Every structure is written in C-alpha cells, then in structure tokens.
Swiss-Prot record:
Identification of the protein by name: Ribosomal RNA large subunit methyltransferase K/L
Gene coding for it: rlmL
First-level EC class: transferase
Recorded catalytic activity of this chain's protein: guanosine(2445) in 23S rRNA + S-adenosyl-L-methionine = N(2)-methylguanosine(2445) in 23S rRNA + S-adenosyl-L-homocysteine + H(+); guanosine(2069) in 23S rRNA + S-adenosyl-L-methionine = N(2)-methylguanosine(2069) in 23S rRNA + S-adenosyl-L-homocysteine + H(+)
Organism: Buchnera aphidicola subsp. Schizaphis graminum (strain Sg)
Enzyme Commission number, as recorded: 2.1.1.173, 2.1.1.264
GO cellular component: cytoplasm
Function according to Swiss-Prot or TrEMBL: Specifically methylates the guanine in position 2445 (m2G2445) and the guanine in position 2069 (m7G2069) of 23S rRNA.
C-alpha cells in the first residue's frame, strides 16, 4: 500500500476528492491545497495518468517532529534512501516552511540534502549529484510547526503540463484549472460547448478530453517515478495501454462539432488549432476567427449547451475600465442568441462580472496563480435588452449625423459626440481615432443603482455600435467630485500612448492611465488661433498640461517657446508632443515649476502668452493656494509684467460661472475682449468654456 498526497489549486479540493474516489483511492483526508490518500500500485499510476485536477502527486516517505536542526538531519538520514533513489540519478531538495528552529528554507533543504548524500556515501563511498534545473528526482519537504513531511515527487513536471499545449497566448490558464472550470461549469457531455474568447483553446481541449475519455497524462513522456526504485514498469505499461484503448473507443463516440472556439485574433486561432492537433482532437473541435460582436448560435433551437469563457480581467496591466464594454457585450450576445443555455464565466473581477447584467445561480471560488477568482454560472433567459428606452440611441445617432456634415471632421481624429444631452444619461462620449472614451458622472444617491447601471450598460453598447468602434477599443471612466491633484493622479500603468491628428498637428493621447486623456478637445480652436498668431513671436504656455498649445505655436513658426507646468509627468508629455512634431531645439524650453512663482521670478518677456489656469490649486509644491475667482486679478498683474508692449494674452477657463470683470482689468491698464464665440467648436457648443484676448491699453 502506498501513502500518497495529491496537491491542487485552492478551491479544487472537492473536485479532486471526487476524482480520486472514482479512481479507487482509499482513506482520503482532505486538507487545504490537496488530499492525502492510500492506494495500491495500480491506484498510484492511475491517479498520475487520469487526474485532471491534481497539480502533482507525491509518495509520502516519512513524517516526524523536530526539536532542533540535528533532528531534521538524523530523521532524514535514518530513511533508507538507497532503496528509494538510484546512485547515478540526479536529485533536488525543495524545502517549504519555517519555524523558530528552521528559519530559512534553504538551510532546511541543505540539511536534508546532506543526510541523503551521507546515506549513500556510507553504503557506496559515492554520492548522487544535485541538479538544480532538471533533476531526475525531486524530494519535497514540508515543515508545519514542528512536523516535517518528506515526500518524493512522482510527477516530475507538474501534471498540468499535458504535452499538447506547445503554443499559447499571454498568461494562459493552466490545464488542470481549466479542467476544474469545465467540471464546475454545469456543462454536460454530448452537449454543445462554445468558448467565445478561446485564446489557445485550453478550456475546449480539456472538455473534449473529458468527453472523449482521453487521459490527461497520455501524451506525457517524462515522469518523476521513472527514477524511483519502487517503480513498477509492468503496472505502468498496463495503465498506459488501457488509457490508449479507452481513448480509441471514446473518440469514436464523441459527437463532431460540439466544441467550438472563437477569438478575435487569427494568430491566436492558429495556435489553438496546432494545440488541438497535438492533443489528437482535431476532428471534434473547431476554431474560428470571430469578434464577440459577431457571435451567433450555430446550433438548432432545440440543442441546449454551455457558453464558457475566461475573458481578460485586467490584472496583467491593471486596466479594468477598458474591459467593461467586453463584459457588457458578452452578456448581451449571450441573451440575444443563446436563450436557455448556460453561461459560465471565470474572472478575478467582481466589478467586471457585474457588467454581464446577469444573476448567477452558482459560484465557485478558485485560485489562478496568485489571483483569487470566481467561476459564476448563469442561466440565460430571454433578452430584454431591446425593450429599453431608445432615447439615448436616437440622440447619439442625431448628433453623429450632424457632425458628419461638419467639414472640420475630415481634419481631426478626436471629437465629442455626446455631452449629457439627456437627463437620464449623464455621459460624455468622445471619439479618438478608432477608440471610444465614455465618461459617466457619478449618479446621486437618490438614483436607483440598478436602473442607472442598466442605462450605462445600454449606452456603452449602443455607442460602440452606432459609432462603429471595436469592443476592445472602448474605455470607460467614472467621474466624481475630486480634488485637482486626484484628477491628475495615475490610475493605471498601461503606457498606452498613441498619436492622433488634429488639423496639421500630431498629438499623443493616453486613454487609459489617467482620468484625462492628455488632450482637451474643447481648446481646439484656441490652439489653432495660437498657431496663427505665433509667427516670429516668443510664446509662453503656462499651466501647459501636455503642451498641445506649444506644438501649435512651434508649427506656426514661433521664435521661441517656453512651456511651464508644475507636473513632471506633463512636462515629459509636452516634450514628447514637441518631439513627434520635430520641434525640439535650443529655443524651445521646458520648465517644471509652480507657474505662479515662476512668472514672478522670470526676467524674460513674451509676445504671446496662453494661460488656462486651474479653478483651484493647493499642490504640496506650492507655497500658497490658488483660487481663480479670488486671485485672477493678481495673476493678470504678474502676467502684465512679462508681456511685451504689443503682446497678447489668451486667457481660457472652464470654471463654472467665472467671468473676467472688464472694469477691474481696465484698472490695471489692460484691455480684455471676450472671444468665446470665435473659438467655440461645433462639438462643444454647450461646453462651459470661455476665452479672452487681453493686451496692454
């Protein structure tokens, strides 16, 4: 009788127990992360060949308590290693756990290694070699409090490495976890299974292996037990023979076309097809390149199956907000075409799962590497989505139709289509080339959350459909009242910059990492005005943000450009914007400083100044706070000192209810003319944005 331990992913213990019982295992003891059990040699080999859920299977050699480090050595030395290992085979010791005796796992591993080699040396005057990378045998030691477990890894490589997956996408899900997802999904054999975002096809391949009675270990050639002296080659060969026979029978019983995978990336589909061939399942699984938005049910109405998916959940790049549209569409397409089917979705993001707009009937908590994930199973009911009020769709179509007649639209790649036009849809919708940014204003607490959420999901879906934007190119942002410093804090770290065209100018935007994108499109005609006024001028861009105005001045053949902002992030962004327009030279300088202090200290004079000051600022880098309504006259006095006699200031602001008092401006010997209507652009007619042209009297 062999005493064994099968390890598994967190949350898979119950599935593993059921599997081992079916294989004939005895005296099972479930612990966190695995199961202890007993079995004859046939059970040992069957569990290695047939376990879909186990990560590894170990032979338990000995367990003992220790009072000091010498106890660890002595107890290990007393094991008859010469009856377990071959002298000529390499080995490696892995030690897990620490206590007040063994404070370092490497120290524990060395103690056990010394005991093993000393055992061999005592008998043969020779010792086996260590191999840290590809050992023939792995000895695993677990220390829990003062109890040590010593085991032999019979698996070799982890059991999830079935041998068929030679090609995979970024961050593929492990095969044994995929099997656990399939077995927990509610899918039944001989019913259709569709994965609409299949990646390298692991979920479908694992399901097809179950359906065709193909053993997960059938294609593996390397095993840890082959370097174990207790290995029974005859029993193993019989196990292998039976597994091959079962697959030969099982594949014939398998119904064709019951496993279908789709993915938007044709290259990924090619990888999945190669993996299926490696698994000898190419006759029962089909893969197609297809966007989620084109997903339809290929089966007859009476055939009920399961949709299964492990969609991206933003952990790798920390970008949940640009996956919202994907989850919305998955929910919508499921309800639209797969009534009465089951949907099973695996994700680490409860936030994103909420956008499926479905209630699960069963949940499973599983661990995917370091991530705690949830598998949620849903029953798909008749789609009620089309019955929602169409006022938003109609308004968006109307707005877009108007904009298409606008000549400027041919010259710009960023424009606004919707800006809170309807009271029930407090959204901003902006197009950036082939990307869509939708911003939702935080609803008041008096608004029913479910209604607001449903409206948002509807708006997101119809926005991308009406504007013909790919689902993967939709970014959602949530706006709430916040301090200015929060507005410019980094939210994510995708570093997803790309260039958009605005007239003759190239500008970098980043739709994901910050609340704002790096370009205020409502300033578009102000920037154009700056470009037309800047020829031969010394231009100053204060509170420069990402320096778009500086680029216009440079392309307008200004004499020099000074770009000033307190944020290093935006100074660097400004430099990149200037660089892609070939405007980096010694006359164009960038200064990271508090703008209010800098204009007092500078000795330079300017012909053209653009300033778009904040409503309020209280940065740690500033000595005093700034409030526009309170301090703008003082600001204008300081600007006057650095403005040349025939110079101009373009002053812009989006501050609510802010107006320059022309009489107060006159008192400081400046003349101000409101030019808001001159610089108002068709896609921002309602925007609370005002501009003035100011000069010396």
């Amino acid at each position: 009788m062999n005493y064994l331990f099968a390890s598994t992913n967190f949350g898979c213990e119950e599935l593993l127990e059921k599997e081992l019982r079916a294989l004939g295992a005895k005296n099972l003891k479930v612990v966190k992360g695995g199961i202890y059990y007993e079995g004859e040699d046939s059970i040992l080999y069957n569990s290695l060949m047939w376990s879909r859920i186990a990560s590894r299977i170990f032979l338990c050699i000995k367990k003992f308590t220790i009072k000091n480090s010498n106890d660890l050595y002595k107890n290990t030395y007393n094991i008859n290693w010469t009856q377990i290992l071959y002298l000529e085979k390499t080995f490696l010791v892995k030690f897990r756990g620490t206590n007040n005796i063994i404070r370092n796992s490497l120290f524990g591993a060395l103690k056990i290694k010394d005991a093993i080699v000393d055992t061999f040396y005592q008998k043969y005057s020779a010792r086996p070699n260590i191999n840290l990378l590809t050992p023939d045998v792995r000895i695993i030691s677990y220390l829990c409090q003062n109890l040590v477990h010593i085991m032999l890894d019979l698996s070799g490589e982890a059991l999830n490495k079935r041998g068929y997956r030679k090609f995979f996408n970024i961050s593929p899900i492990k095969e044994n976890l995929s099997a656990a997802i399939i077995l927990s999904s509610g899918w039944k054999k001989n019913t259709p299974l569709i994965d609409p975002m299949c990646g390298s096809g692991t979920l479908l391949i694992e399901a097809a292996m179950i359906s065709s009675d193909r053993a997960p270990g059938l294609k593996r050639t390397e095993w840890g037990f082959k370097s174990w002296k207790g290995h029974k080659e005859k029993v193993w060969k019989e196990t292998l023979k039976k597994a091959k026979e079962r697959f030969k029978i099982g594949i014939k019983k398998c119904l064709k076309n019951y496993f279908i995978g789709y993915d938007c990336n044709p290259d990924v589909i090619k990888k999945a097809q190669k993996n299926v061939i490696n698994a000898n399942l190419e006759n029962i699984i089909s893969f197609f390149a297809c966007n989620l938005s084109h997903l339809k049910n290929p089966y007859q109405k009476e055939e009920i199956g399961t949709l299964i998916s492990n969609p991206p959940y933003g952990e790798r790049c920390k970008t949940e907000n640009n996956l919202i549209a994907l989850y919305i569409e998955l929910g919508i397409m499921s309800k639209k075409y797969f009534e009465k089917w089951n949907l099973s979705v695996f994700s680490s993001s409860e936030f994103l799962l909420n956008f499926l707009q479905m209630k699960s009937y069963k949940n499973f908590c599983l661990k995917n590497g370091p991530l705690y994930c949830t598998l949620k199973n849903y029953e798909i009911f008749l789609n009620k989505f089309n019955n929602t009020n169409k006022e938003y769709e109609n308004r968006l179509e109307k707005n877009f139709k108007k904009l298409k007649k606008w000549n400027d639209l041919k010259e710009i790649e960023c424009f606004r289509v919707y800006d809170s036009d309807l009271p029930n849809y407090k959204l901003i919708v902006d197009v950036y080339k082939k990307w869509l940014v939708i911003q939702e204003y935080q609803a008041p607490k008096s608004i029913n959350y479910e209604k607001a959420h449903k409206r948002l999901c509807s708006a997101i879906y119809h926005s991308k459909e009406i504007l013909s934007i790919p689902t993967n190119n939709v970014v959602i942002k949530f706006r709430k009242k916040q301090k200015r410093k929060e507005q410019y804090q980094k939210l994510f770290n995708s570093n997803s910059f790309f260039i958009i065209r605005e007239y003759h100018v190239k500008l970098l935007v980043n739709l994901i990492d910050y609340l704002d994108t790096g370009l205020f499109s409502e300033h578009r005609l102000v920037r154009k005005l700056i470009g037309s006024m800047s020829k031969g001028k010394d231009f100053l861009n204060l509170f420069s943000y990402t320096g778009a105005a500086s680029v216009y001045a440079g392309l307008g053949k200004s004499k020099s450009i000074t770009t000033v902002d307190i944020s290093n992030t935006y100074i660097q962004w400004s430099m990149r914007n200037m660089s892609i327009n070939n405007l980096i030279n010694s006359k164009n300088i960038f200064i990271q400083k508090d703008c209010l202090e800098w204009i007092i200290s500078t000795k330079n004079k300017f012909d053209l100044i653009f300033i778009n000051p904040p409503t309020f600022s209280n940065s740690k880098r500033m000595k005093k706070s700034f409030e526009l309504k309170r301090d703008y006259i003082k600001l204008m006095i300081n600007l006057k000192q650095i403005l040349r006699k025939d110079g101009n200031i373009i002053f812009s602001s989006s501050t609510h209810n802010f107006e320059i008092d022309l009489n107060n401006i006159k008192k400081i010997n400046l003349y101000a003319k409101k030019i808001t209507n001159l610089v108002k652009t068709k896609d921002f007619l309602k925007k609370n944005y005002h501009s003035w042209l100011i000069k010396h009297i």
